[in-house]
Amino acid sequence: MSKDLNPEKALIFRIVHRDNIEPMLVDGCHCRATMKGVKYTEIGNPELIQKRTDKAVPIDPGGTLSDYVPFYFTPYSPMLYNIKTGYNGIKQRPMRDIAILVSSLHRLAKLKVPFVFTDRHAYLKLAQFSDDLADLNWIIWPTLQARDFTKDDIDKFEKYQAEALVYRHVPIAALLGIVCYDEGAMAEIEAAAAKAGAKVKVKAERRWFL
């Protein structure tokens, strides 16, 4: 997988709780701003999730970070590490309860799904935003390939968490696949996809889960 993290493929990855998979297979992924009152199992930092509602996106289509569905450019993220270990006060969860959605910026562009991306964690003041695929050289691809998110260099740590932000909604057609922890989880997701009539590849890949 590490070699596949490059600008030519521009793969993007979203970590979700498996409880959210079934409705997502029916209607895709919606941004937080449009999901008020909808049952959804959050897995990130609750304080940061709330703060993102006030962080403006400085380029079109605008809005705030909560108007976007966030992805990373790697499945091996600090967020997943925190969920796995319970680090920094994040609720610890078994990896079998987690699924990773896979898409790509090229796929989104082909489907004309609006998106922007950043050079580092989108909430940070220094974050740069772009919707131009020519700016994918902002992403520190060799560091992502090395799975190096140690905090020996803060700039590196921030840039490791660069985000792809999909405006409002990610349709099922934009997904290249769903990766889960084991064969049992894969069977359950495949059954849910069949029930929803969603044509999406499902794969068990334990190595993705750190």
What is each PLM-predicted segment?
Residues 1-73, 77-210:
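Active-site-proximal loop/hinge segments that shape catalytic or ion-binding/gating pockets
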